[in-house]
From Swiss-Prot:
Name of the protein this chain belongs to: Protamine-1B
Function: Protamines substitute for histones in the chromatin of sperm during the haploid phase of spermatogenesis. They compact sperm DNA into a highly condensed, stable and inactive complex.
Keyword line: Chromosome, Developmental protein, Differentiation, DNA condensation, DNA-binding, Nucleosome core, Nucleus, Spermatogenesis
GO BP annotation list: cell differentiation; chromosome condensation; spermatogenesis
Organ and tissue specificity: Testis.
Gene Ontology annotations for the cellular component aspect, listed alphabetically: nucleosome; nucleus
Cell compartments where the protein resides: Nucleus; Chromosome
Domain of life: Eukaryota
Region of interest (Disordered), residue spans: 1-31
GO molecular function, one term: DNA binding
Length: 31
């Protein structure tokens, strides 16, 4: 059971960097 909880935490960490990269791309296109 502890292994399934670790996989859930990994997906949450990967979703945070994805939002950061999308905001950086939008700022570069506006310039």
């Amino acid at each position: 059971m502890p292994r399934r909880r670790r996989a859930s935490r990994r997906i949450r960490r990967r979703r945070r960097p994805r939002v950061s990269r999308r905001r950086r791309r939008g700022g570069r296109r506006r310039r």
